[in-house]
């Protein structure tokens, strides 16, 4: 059933802005991104929003809806009371470019800090072999669509801008975990590197990153906590230390 929704949408740029009120038609089955597009068509032709696939697979349309990080294309209007006012704002952790579009280059800088997969030197392409159970261990992490909702909601950088230089964020700590689990990766001590160089110690496992993940990846339980455990083992367990000396990979 169609109805008129009340929206408050943040309008502005890097120099500042404010929430602007709108009333817009909503049809059955629509998502928030549909309503933003209708606003562009009928009332705010210059409203800036980043989007691409409209299928929850590209991660482009990340924003905050009523203060909670979400994908605009995966948030159905039917989840809201028709009488409530829906507030849509840009991702708070990243600098605003214009309206709902933010500069997420922080994440690409952090991606470059993570050493890439390092295969054994004596193996040629086409010679890599893995057990299926090893493939499945990190399969969950490869579902990431890099929407950066986890990066945005993590209070380590959301509430503390000064931590950005030292903290890679849950998405890229998860990447370290994925590679550390890979049986053919020969890069030494990724878990220790995550602790010493990527700010793993800043994470206090509040699970806020897991809660906002649209792919339902258990980032905290399956990536961050195991990475913390391996970092502690490799730095402080004398048996593990001796084993690493005797049986160093690569």
Label the model's feature ranges:
Residues 30-42, 89-250:
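Ferredoxin-type iron-sulfur electron-transfer modules in oxidoreductases and energy-metabolism complexes
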């Amino acid at each position: 059933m169609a109805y008129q929704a009340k929206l408050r949408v943040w309008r502005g740029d890097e120099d500042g802005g404010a929430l602007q009120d709108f009333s817009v038609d909503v049809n059955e089955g629509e998502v928030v991104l549909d309503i933003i597009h209708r606003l562009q068509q009928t009332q705010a032709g210059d409203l800036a929003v980043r989007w691409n696939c409209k299928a929850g697979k590209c991660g482009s349309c990340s924003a905050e809806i009523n203060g909670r990080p979400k994908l605009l294309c995966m948030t159905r209007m039917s989840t809201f009371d028709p009488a409530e006012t829906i507030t849509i704002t840009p991702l708070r952790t990243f600098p605003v470019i214009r309206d709902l579009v933010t500069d997420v280059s922080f994440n690409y800088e952090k991606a470059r800090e993570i050493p890439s997969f390092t295969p054994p030197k004596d193996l040629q392409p086409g010679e890599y072999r893995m057990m299926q159970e090893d493939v499945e261990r990190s399969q969950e992490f490869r579902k990431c669509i890099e929407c950066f909702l986890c990066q945005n909601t993590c209070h380590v950088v959301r509430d503390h801008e000064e931590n950005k230089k030292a903290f890679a964020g849950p998405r890229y700590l998860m990447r370290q975990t994925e590679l550390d689990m890979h049986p053919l990766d020969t890069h030494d001590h990724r878990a220790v590197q995550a602790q010493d160089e990527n700010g793993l110690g800043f994470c206090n496992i509040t699970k806020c990153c897991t809660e906002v993940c649209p792919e339902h990846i258990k980032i905290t339980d399956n990536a961050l906590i195991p990475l913390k455990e391996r970092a502690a083992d490799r730095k402080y367990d004398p048996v593990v230390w001796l084993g690493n000396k005797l049986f160093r990979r690569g």
